[in-house]
């Protein structure tokens, strides 16, 4: 993510097909590595990025999706704080940049379809599973959590009901420490995550559908 919302990491291809066009990072799996290891390697090689959260998304296999030959792609999506990384393009990537999901350039292959499916999956999951929390600082304001959900959902939420539900889950802990006051007003309350409750909810899930 970035400050202004969800962004997608893209690389500019420096080989055919689709030379000089933007695409998702990716490549072929080596004989001695798992699919997840291939994802991690390609991200490191093409953009200098390591991943916090990795999930298999979908398998794309239309016969005409790659002009070279029949290629079946197993796609993954992950979440990182873009501010934590200085992108470094290498191997077959001429450049690597973050693009807001509402301002995407034309994409090579069927990568626009892959991005759309990833966004839809993410927005469906966050109402029943605590994903994305690793994008916040270790200590955070509740408004930071609200902003995270609104960025991921792409819309406003019912803040009062959202806070009541989140607090009832026991997922976050109110700290004695207060946030520094940057403007006139009272210092904001700081929170942290209950790591054990977080692990439990990752397994059992919850339902925020009616509150968002």
Features from the language model and the residues they span:
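Long, intrinsically disordered, low-complexity Ser/Thr/Pro-rich regulatory/activation regions
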Residues: 178-212
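Short histidine-centered catalytic/ligand-binding loop motif
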Residues: 24-32, 134-135
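N-terminal strand-loop-strand
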Residues: 1-23
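Active-site segment of metal-dependent pyrophosphate-handling enzymes
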Residues: 36-40, 44-90, 102-103, 123-132, ...
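Short helix-coil junctions and helix-kink-helix linkers
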Residues: 147-156
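NUDIX/MutT-family hydrolases
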Residues: 77, 87-121, 135-143, 161-174, ...
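Long, charge-rich, low-complexity alpha-helical segments
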Residues: 156, 164-175, 187-196
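Short, well-ordered beta-strand micro-motif
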Residues: 10-12, 77-79, 192
């Amino acid at each position: 993510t970035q400050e202004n919302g969800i962004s997608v990491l893209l690389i500019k291809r420096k080989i055919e097909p689709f030379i000089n066009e933007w695409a998702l990072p990716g490549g072929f799996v080596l004989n001695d590595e798992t699919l997840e290891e291939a994802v991690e390697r390609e991200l490191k090689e093409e953009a200098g990025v390591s991943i916090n959260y990795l999930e298999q998304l979908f398998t794309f296999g239309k016969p005409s999706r790659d002009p070279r030959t029949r290629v079946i792609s197993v796609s993954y999506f992950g979440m990182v704080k873009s501010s934590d990384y200085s992108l470094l393009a290498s191997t077959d990537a001429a450049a690597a940049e973050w693009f807001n999901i509402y301002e995407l350039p034309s994409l090579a292959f069927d990568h626009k379809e892959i991005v759309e499916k990833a966004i839809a999956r993410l927005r469906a999951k966050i109402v029943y599973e605590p994903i994305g929390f690793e994008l916040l600082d270790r200590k955070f304001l509740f408004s930071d959590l609200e902003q995270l959900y609104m960025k991921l959902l792409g819309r406003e939420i019912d803040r009062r009901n959202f806070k009541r539900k989140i607090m009832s889950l026991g997922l976050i802990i109110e700290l004695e420490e207060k946030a520094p006051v940057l403007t006139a007003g009272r210092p904001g309350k700081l929170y942290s995550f209950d790591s054990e409750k977080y692990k439990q909810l990752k397994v059992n899930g919850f339902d925020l559908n009616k509150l968002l």
